[in-house]
Amino acid sequence: MRRAYLNTMKLVLPAISKNERMARTQVCAMVATLNPTVTELGDIRCALSEAVTNAIVHGYGSPTDVDGKLLYIAVTLYEDRSLKISVRDHGRGIPDIAAAREPLFTTDDTGDRSGMGFSVMEAFCDRVEVMSRVGEGTKVTLYKTLT
């Protein structure tokens, strides 16, 4: 049985660091129409921030080089107060998704990244799905049901 949705939105943004804020603002404004608690909205904001940052930094490798690199974000709100947020890039892809989802796993040798992105997303969402193909990109989908 298919769930009835209340609203849906798609965003396409250049994959640059300042658009992480834009994504959070737009998505949270839409989610706010479901009247979530402050904690629930904070959870969504934090998980989305991690997903977008991962796409920019790891998917494309540069938080400042725009050159045709785009983020695709889709949000669906359902009548049962659940939501789905997908963040997709056409970047490098993840060679080993299971390893990438382990706490503290990082491919960053500069020490700038903690390897906690997926752990944070999983802590704040009911479910996180990751689909990726090396050389083609990654799609991270966040699921949450509000109280």
Predicted regions located by residue number:
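Conserved beta-strand-loop-beta-strand hairpin that lines the nucleotide-binding pocket
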Residues: 1-10, 55-147
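A generic structural signal for short
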Residues: 15-16, 40, 106
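Conserved short strand/loop->alpha-helix "switch" segment adjacent to the catalytic nucleotide/phosphoryl-transfer site
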Residues: 24-50
